[in-house]
Amino acid sequence: MSEEQVNGVTQAVKALVLDPVTGEQVSKTELKKREKQRARELAKAKKQAEKAASAPVAAPKSSSKKEEDLDPSQYFENRSRTIMELRQTKDPNPYPHKFQVTITLPEFIAKYEGLARGETKPEVEVAVAGRVLGLRTAGNKLRFYEIHADGKKLQVMCQAQDADTVDFAAQHEHLRRGDIIGIRGYPGRSNPKGRADGELSIFARQCVLLSPCLRMLPKEHYGLKDLEIRHRQRYLDLIMNRSTRDRFVMRSRIIQYIRHFFDSRDFMEVETPMMNMIAGGATAKPFVTHHNDLDMDLYMRIAPELYLKMLVVGGLDRVYEIGRQFRNEGADLTHNPEFTSIEFYQAYADYYDLMDTTEELLSGLVKDLTGSYKVPYHPEGPEGPKWELDFSRPWRRINMIEYLEEKLNTKFPPGDQLHTPEANAFLRDLCAKHGVECAPPQTCSRLLDKLVGEFIESECINPTFIIGHPQMMSPLAKYHRSDAGLCERFEAFVATKEICNAYTELNDIFDQRARFEEQARQKAQGDDEAQIIDENFCTALEYGLPPTGGWGMGVDRLVMFLTDSNTIREVLLFPHMKPEVQAAEPTVVKE
């Protein structure tokens, strides 16, 4: 931020004034607007009070019930005012430093689930904590809370006869839905009338407010379904939707399984730079950042491939990395500019070995985490058609050129001629004939990739390997040992989407330089995604890279398939979103 921008922000902050009700710093205009609104609400409330005074007396509502009838902005203002007062009086302190939890909710449930109806253990004292998602009262001497924590829920039964040290009414006066509370009490099972089973509960001796929720939570009946809010306010999504928590628990378990798989096979996990002077290792458009001290532009990494191969040159024969990649490309249902990948490199392995490893890893992972090799998937969302993805071995294998020749009923140029101008004209005509669009630059590589996407990838529902790629599409892959012009590479597809890319690594420095030069020519033709020569990597190859297999997989897409999510935003805790329209007047919470 420039000095001029900083000064502008400073002046804007100086112009703010304190809202005595909410404790926020706001502009004078905003404060006047709020004061007028409060005056109108006060007059309205006065009229309603006068009207109510002449009406028949009805049963009183609890404070929390009355507040639930307010609109969210009124609720926030009232709740903020109450908590501001408690911060001053400390009676009670709404933000205590510590509450000693003696047992988690999962542990409590596992330990006391066997209690019989009406059985209690008043001699056992426990302390639990959680967020209140349900609250109901039965008179002045009985309250029930439903608290959630660690993916579990528990009923809190509060009876005036059990209260100790602190007055019963005082304990519960300021507790609302959404608050995080601590409960000290004893385990038991309720004994409700007219029900065969009671509910496992903690019978509270004391309830303590640990952190108030100032915002009104969505109503229990409707929940939180708005996608925009769920993705922008993931914390609220996690509070309200158990399925969201389960999805990210599954994501964590998937990564744990992958890490254990490679650790148990003597691979070493490593970390490589995320900012580089050259964007290499993949065909993609990079993000550019600037290093102020060195006064130079750097690229956010698009793949860790080149660094990992340098480590194999250095004698680390089995390495892998799980980390973030950054690609300055479009965002859609399966793409996010920032995403997680796993790459591994294994000396003395080729792409045939890697296909076996891929099947072993993913078939085993699916079986271990879901209990079956088959998982349901709805590519268009829960209301759309249902696919069954079968990860059992062996997987189908499709030879790219042979399959296209069969599908399109035409003969392709030989593999070693697919990079020529004649091949380019052939591919252009083929795309035009079949209505396949390819945006400029229409290189041979891009044209062929569009045909593959239209006629092969669209048929890959169950896990499928596509093999037989031309060298021009794979600047870092080794040439095929028996098919001229092709290379030893495969891509694995599931539900029509690529999840893995692997090949026998190119370790011939002379061939590698020639490939880089071809990529440079493509970049000169306007292909922003083409790679440029990385002299540091070439120097490493001059020391000798052993025969090596290299493999990469997108973690996010795999999580999508195993959690039945049809958009990548559902499996990213904080997905990339366009900025919201900002309010005209800035607000700053006063310390």
UniProtKB/Swiss-Prot annotation:
Keyword terms of this UniProt record: Aminoacyl-tRNA synthetase, ATP-binding, Cytoplasm, Ligase, Nucleotide-binding, Protein biosynthesis
Keyword Cytoplasm listed: yes
SUPFAM superfamilies found in the cross-reference section: Class II aaRS and biotin synthetases, Nucleic acid-binding proteins
A biological process from GO: lysyl-tRNA aminoacylation
EC numbers: 6.1.1.6
Disulphide bonds in the chain: none
Location(s), subcellular: Cytoplasm
Molecular-function annotations in GO: ATP binding; lysine-tRNA ligase activity; tRNA binding
Record-stated family: Belongs to the class-II aminoacyl-tRNA synthetase family.
Record CDD domains: LysRS_core, LysRS_N
Class of the enzyme per the UniProt entry, highest EC level: ligase
Listed NCBIfam families: lysS_bact, PRK00484.1
PROSITE patterns membership: AA_TRNA_LIGASE_II (PS50862)
Subunit structure: Homodimer.
InterPro entries on file: Aa-tRNA-synt_II (IPR004364), aa-tRNA-synth_II (IPR006195), aa-tRNA-synth_II/BPL/LPL (IPR045864), Lys-tRNA-ligase_II (IPR002313), Lys-tRNA-ligase_II_bac/euk (IPR034762), Lys-tRNA-ligase_II_N (IPR044136), Lys-tRNA-synth_II_C (IPR018149), NA-bd_OB-fold (IPR012340)
Stretches with biased composition (Low complexity): 51-62
Main location class: cytoplasm
Protein name stated in the entry: Lysine--tRNA ligase, cytoplasmic
